Amino acid sequence: MFIDQAVDGMTAGKDYISIVSSDNLALGMYIADELAKAIGGTGDVAAMYFANDFYVTNLRYIGFIARLMVKYPNMKLVAVAGHDDPNKGQEVAQALLARYPKITGLYGSWSIPAMGAATAAQVAGRTPKNFKIVCENFDQIVAANLAKGGFIAGISSQRPYDQGVAEATAGSLALIGAPVPTYIVVPPLAVDRQNLPVAYQTIYHIALPGNMMADLKK
């Protein structure tokens, strides 16, 4: 069993049972939807993408770009910048903000570079009211920032708990000789402040922490 992608050279049904993955193309599309919702569907935006050739992040970026082009004609993608290190998020975002001061939104890859971009935005004198960041990968840091109304305005998340359940189920079925699909997709989830409590429960299978719930009510 594999999560997200198999090892090169291995054959499904022979060398491994199945791949269980999020729908990464849809995940990227949801990121575009969240950015459009955050900035009102119009304005100049930029994107930070993972420059290394990695199938999962490639699909997410493709989904994001395709959705922008097809669904949001009033949003102009004025700049894209690749990074090969999530810890360079602040550096990359600072350059984008300096060169394109009119951008009102940013796709910040996943949580670590996105929070670096949030720091860059703050240093540049931007506020969560005039600059929005969206990202993939739901963790405690971006969830907390979203809850308190910070720069993180939307997240497109995998459902790793449910992916784990699917992987265990598929593996168990294979052990008893039952047929198992060679590729299993778990749908992603778009998260904003409005659905954060429900989304947190869906993703982690536990309730939203009290501090985040309190921030939502402020």
Residue ranges and their predicted role:
Residues 1-26, 44, 139-148, 152:
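Flexible loop/hinge segments that line or gate small-molecule binding clefts
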Residues 1-4, 18-21, 44-49, 78-79, ...:
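Structural recognition of the beta-strand scaffold that forms the well-ordered cores
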Residues 27-31, 55-75, 88, 92, ...:
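Short, solvent-exposed amphipathic alpha-helices that sit
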Residues 48, 52, 67-68, 159, ...:
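Hinge/cleft segment of the Venus flytrap/periplasmic-binding protein
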Residues 49-59, 107-112:
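Extracytoplasmic "Venus flytrap"
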Residues 64, 78, 82-145:
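Hydrophobic alpha-helical
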